[in-house]
Amino acid sequence: MGSDMTTMQTMAHMMPGMEPDRDGYGCTAAIITAVPVEADSVSRLFDGWVTVKVPGDPQTYRKAAYEAGGEERIVITAQQPYMGMASASMLAAKIIYTFRPKYLIMCGIAAGIGEESAQLYGDVLVPDMIWDYSTGKFVGKDESEIAFGSIGFQPRPVSVRIDPKMLASVMQTVGSADNEFHVHVGPMACGTSVVANREIVDKRIHALFPHTVGLDMESYSIYYAAEHCAGPRPLALVAKSICDFADSTKSDQYQKFAAYTSSGYVKYLFDHYLF
């Protein structure tokens, strides 16, 4: 307990306005990104970013003050050192324990793998459930219904869900007349590899959860970290926009646009529903 208090006191001394509130939260929100194009888009949401360095931590954080509801809100952001779940898990855990955000947000880019006629570049994907499709066992091709050449795969998916309070806020935006973003709410698959082959989607994802709307490499870690950390726990949200469709047409062409709509939707949530 003494060590925890020392950490919070140190952060409060370093960053005025970061003193824990009565519920124990040290800042309003923390936004995590995985790649530079996502971080660049988040940097445009607020003015006056300042760099924050935590003693003993190589990660660079940035802080901005944001006026909303007649109060000053503090937003922290950081970009992962690397793509993937391991890096996302570590960064999410460090942010939670160092800054104690009320909201833990990940925005950025993802693949759309829902109904093709219903999804467009730049559409926002908000997962109500995220499952790790990469967990399982590699076996002989005759030992599983999922096979790639001579290799079979027996999936053992694990999942995490969005908090009902956060989902309620998201669902309000879906039906709101002033929401300019096209939002898809549904399951998202998360795995360890970039996918540019529709056979992977069909055999390893839609064969298990046919209504899965999106695919990425980090989202599972965000909901998992928020669910399993010590209190006060943040409310977690993943809001990523479609930049490709996990097939042979995959390219970087729409990444900036997708990053823009993703961060824009997060700002819309802040302005109208969360702050």
Where are these regions (language model features)?
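Intrinsic-disorder/coil detector with helix-boundary
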Residues: 2-275
